[in-house]
Amino acid sequence: MWWRRHASKVAVGLIGFFAGVWGVGVGEVPLFDWDEVNFAECAREMRVSGNYLYPQIGFLPFWEKPPLFFWVQAGFMAIFGENAWGARLPNVFISALTLAVLYYLGRRWHGEGFGLTWLFLQGVSLLPSFYARSGLIDPLFNLFMLLATVCGAYAVEKGRLGWALGMGFCAGLATLTKGPVGLLMPALAVGTLLLFRRQLPRIGVLLLGGGLAFGMVVGPWLALLLQSDGGKLLADFWAYQWRLFSTPDAGHGGPWYYHLVVVAIGMFPASLWAIGAWRLPFRKLPAPAQALLWLTAWTLVVFSIVKTKILHYSSLSYYGVSYLAAWVWLYHRRWIWRTGGVLTGLIGLLLAIGTLCVGVIMHFWPRWIQQIKDPFMQAAIQNTPLDWEGTEGWPGFVLAGGLAVLYLLPWKNTGRLGLLGLVCLLWEALMLRQLAGRVEAYTQAPLRQFCTEKAQEGALVWPVGFKSYIPFFYGQMSPDASPAVVGDTDLFQQKLLAGEMPFPVYFVSRVDRYKPFQEAHHLEIVEQRGAYVLLAPPYRGPGQAGK
């Protein structure tokens, strides 16, 4: 086939196409609370304070994450601005680079056709495409762990020190991106490969080379961190990591099978095809491919055990799922158009119907709004001036129509794969364009508007009764009007409520949580917008809101 003769050019074209699709409008919808806004604020505060050693929130040390991703984000913000564009564009480039890595690995292991198929299936699957448009840490974190695992597998297979150094280097970068899981997951995968292939004598090369490179990457940062605060930040960081493992932190609990469901739906259509890989000749695969599948298995096992259940925790498994789907497509295609084809059609039809129903359901919201028991959600829908015509879910027709064409036209297999991928990619892009802005309007737009409006007046907006990073980022918090002034966030809030700070301040809360603060501190309601209430203190201190 012509594409086999020009595989590298096709790969470059596909990667450019995906990057273009992901990049279009990536900054049009504001950043979402918590994670996107949290990470963008860490990068912004690095730029404002000039402190790049560790992340900050409220210009106080933020011990939940290491700094590497925020360095990258701060660099993009220097070019594209401190906004949604600057926060999300890094992942467009990182995800495009990831596709290039998958193509290279697939071609090296199984040939050009496999590399292109793996690249394509990863790019069109739902959650990888979604994360490419996000401001989250995980695309960069996962890429480093993938590279560390592959390098470690080659070290096991070839026994060369250079590959062990590569594993330690990439694991070190992963650790600087999000924490010790960046070392744990590649170590589990490569360690299992050592046992499976009975190459235990090569553990010395791995420990020596990997440990040396890991220490060279992470060691200087740890030394500077210890020198700066005597180890308190590191102690807080480890306590946080243990809390994530042992408790459903921040209310993010769930059943043990949570991530199995997430991967099954989030990796559509690749996940359905991957089911057919039960005939995979695992022992005949190259060592790095075996390590990748061990990495996938360990990801699902570890994060099914971890008490905190968050959507992107299992995102490291996506590489293995798309790898299995590519194998089934190339070597077990009969399963694709029998069982796999039926499953793809059924799930695709359900997704299409669900998309179509969104607009219809919201069009009739006055009929069912009283059935909602959550006062915040009820107020958000009732008080947000959004018109629903009932046709907003029209991208569902794109998915349903594409599936119909896929099954009715007598196209060749390559054409079918391309059509299915493009339909999924187009449906997701259109759905996000139609609905993401409306979700933001209900959930956080009034809060964001309060913060930006009052920031223009030179006032601080502070959240009470709920946690949000929006006042920090969209309120453009400055060091001299932040918790850093008193050295503690809780103390800062107490002083704000007591009127002891020398700058104008407003308070914002949810409609279901503001009354205790209003009554205890005699706050005045300035405005209710959507599901949020803007409050001002009654005192008349110098420069204070409510003056």
Identify the residue ranges that each predicted region occupies.
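Membrane-embedded architecture of ER/inner-membrane glycosylation machinery
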Residues: 165, 280-547
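Membrane-integral, polyisoprenol-dependent glycosyltransferases
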Residues: 1-338, 390, 472
